[in-house]
């Protein structure tokens, strides 16, 4: 969806006040990208009647509601690992360690087109 949004913004920046799905297709096609017209139409319908300034302001409000790493680290408890802790952890046999789980960055609570 981001490529369609970027193409929409490029069209508006070039002076087109109301870009269509065809305009998005032209922008993306100029750099050799495939276009799904259903997604292009979804972006156009979601942004029709809205100024780019409104969209940016709404996006900034949503971004500011998501905690950043600095805020999370300030809230997180401080854990101290001493050499004896490492030795005790290393002496436990039969335990398997799980690797870090991958995080999903699917929506992150933004819901751009909600």
Swiss-Prot record:
CDD domains under this entry? Ribosomal_P2
Q: Name one GO biological process term.
A: cytoplasmic translational elongation
Q: Which GO terms describe its molecular function?
A: structural constituent of ribosome
Which key words tag this protein in UniProt? Phosphoprotein, Ribonucleoprotein, Ribosomal protein
Q: Where is the composition biased (Basic and acidic residues)?
A: 92-102
Extract the ranges annotated as region (Disordered). 84-114
Modification note: Phosphorylated.
**Gene Ontology CC, one term:** cytosolic large ribosomal subunit
Which Pfam families does the entry link to? Ribosomal_60s
Superkingdom is Eukaryota
Q: What does this protein do?
A: Plays an important role in the elongation step of protein synthesis.
> What do we know about how this protein assembles, alone or with others?
P1 and P2 exist as dimers at the large ribosomal subunit.
By sequence similarity, the record places it as follows:
Belongs to the eukaryotic ribosomal protein P1/P2 family.
Spell out the protein name for this chain: Large ribosomal subunit protein P2
The gene designation is rpp-2
């Amino acid at each position: 969806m981001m490529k369609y949004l970027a193409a929409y913004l490029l069209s508006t920046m070039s002076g087109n006040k109301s870009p269509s799905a065809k305009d998005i297709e032209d922008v993306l096609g100029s750099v050799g990208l495939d276009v799904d017209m259903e997604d292009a139409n979804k972006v156009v319908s979601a942004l029709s009647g809205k100024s780019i300034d409104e969209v940016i302001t709404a996006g900034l409000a949503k971004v500011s509601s998501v905690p950043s790493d600095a805020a999370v680290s300030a809230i997180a408890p401080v854990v101290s690992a001493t050499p004896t802790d490492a030795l005790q952890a290393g002496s436990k046999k039969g335990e398997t360690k799980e690797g870090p789980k991958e995080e999903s960055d699917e929506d992150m609570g933004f819901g751009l087109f909600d």
